[in-house]
Amino acid sequence: MEFLDLPGRSRASGTVRLPGSKSISNRVLLLAALAEGVTDVYDVLDSDDTRYMLAALQALGVGVEDRGDNHWRVTGVAGAFPARQAELFLGNAGTAFRPLTAVLALSGGDYVLDGVARMHERPIGDLVDALRQLGGRIDYRGTLGFPPLHVHPPQAGADVAHIRGNVSSQFLTGLLMALPLRRLRTRVEVVGELISKPYIEITLAMLRRFGVEVARDGWQAFSVAADACYRSPREIYVEGDASSASYFLAAGAIGGGPVRVEGVGRDSVQGDVGFADALAAMGARIAMGPNWIEACAPAQGRLKAIDLDCNAIPDAAMTLAVAALFADGTTTLRNIASWRVKETDRIAAMATELRKVGATVEEGDDFLRVTPPETLRAGAVIDTYDDHRMAMCLSLVSLGGVAVRINDPGCVAKTFPGYFNAFAEIAR
């Protein structure tokens, strides 16, 4: 297995230009494909997950042209994919798999969607059930409720669908993106609490950019009009990735700073910019502009522990678990059940790896409680579980002045291929 040895460091400062947001990149690429007209998409994230989406769109007959420098020109199909049959391999890209499942289920072709072994363990039954209510015809090719899937042309369905909100916000995102293809007024009602609401806000904002306004009743019901259709905005710029910003902001809070990230800020549509507020609650000094955020360590003393509901920042909250190693007291992260159905079971994985460096960790179904050791244990070998965020989060341990080995560092290619180079630039 490949590994990367990170030397112990104690300072962090500098400026990082963030890569494009994964969540926004894949939404925009799919919407541009469905729209009427040509869309120039700038600052697209170059990563495994976006490559899977681009390859899928090409297989479906969409014109996608690489114009260089993360600029893609997408020629929209105005709702109907030219390829009526295709087999799509989508790796472990939930931001591609879930929306494409919904769109293809309502678009009138015969398609197979598959992914890596971990994707076969990530639930999709709630989305499939909702699509079936709308007339979708979807078969499981393996375990009931999980990929791979075989999608057939839809039949007539209801004008209301119900979907559970507490498993993955990507299910609702996929449904909302697919609804304009029906050309019927359709209402989606959320059963129970909707998790990760900021990701739905991203979806609604992107649909609006492509000409579709979703009417909503709080967070419990969403409606799309019969005449809704996607129209190209001609050009669109992708924000920097706010989840990726969390590692560098935490580095500034741990290693003195200032560390500035460029590409997200006060004007961001991404909920993970709320990570900066969590760091501030821990005592970090935070400054923010429209398109940048800067973090420094507390003026005096160490960070302090927090007890936080992380529903709104599920991905960035992972970084808080590692920041807790550098805080006085016991940090509790709550409402993180969605971690268990991500690229790996992130609650179990994080608990295991934090214990390797000496932390006392308690894990529950939907919480993680971290008490730092008096001294971090040097020489830990960190396993990453083919999970990009595990690798990036746990690199921060090295800012405690201890060397760490990161196994399979290449897994960061899922969202941030240049992460370790960027980290080396700011770690002193």
Curated annotation (Swiss-Prot):
Gene Ontology terms: biological process: amino acid biosynthetic process; aromatic amino acid family biosynthetic process; chorismate biosynthetic process
EC number(s) given by UniProt: 2.5.1.19
Reaction(s) the record says it catalyses: 3-phosphoshikimate + phosphoenolpyruvate = 5-O-(1-carboxyvinyl)-3-phosphoshikimate + phosphate
Pathway(s) where this gene product acts: Metabolic intermediate biosynthesis; chorismate biosynthesis; chorismate from D-erythrose 4-phosphate and phosphoenolpyruvate: step 6/7
GO cellular component, as recorded: cytoplasm
UniProt entry keywords in alphabetical sequence: Amino-acid biosynthesis, Aromatic amino acid biosynthesis, Cytoplasm, Transferase
GO molecular function: 3-phosphoshikimate 1-carboxyvinyltransferase activity
UniProt binding sites for phosphoenolpyruvate: K22, G94, R122, Q170, R346, R389, K414
PROSITE patterns xref list: EPSP_SYNTHASE_1, EPSP_SYNTHASE_2
Compartments reported by the entry: Cytoplasm
Enzyme class at the top of the EC tree: transferase
Keyword Ubl conjugation: no
Catalytic machinery residues: D315
Chief place where the protein resides: cytoplasm
Binding, 3-phosphoshikimate: K22, S23, R27, S168, S169, Q170, S196, D315, K342
Coiled coil spans: none
Keyword Signal attributed: no
Function: Catalyzes the transfer of the enolpyruvyl moiety of phosphoenolpyruvate (PEP) to the 5-hydroxyl of shikimate-3-phosphate (S3P) to produce enolpyruvyl shikimate-3-phosphate and inorganic phosphate.
Subunit structure: Monomer.
Family, per entry: Belongs to the EPSP synthase family.
Protein name: 3-phosphoshikimate 1-carboxyvinyltransferase
The encoding gene: aroA
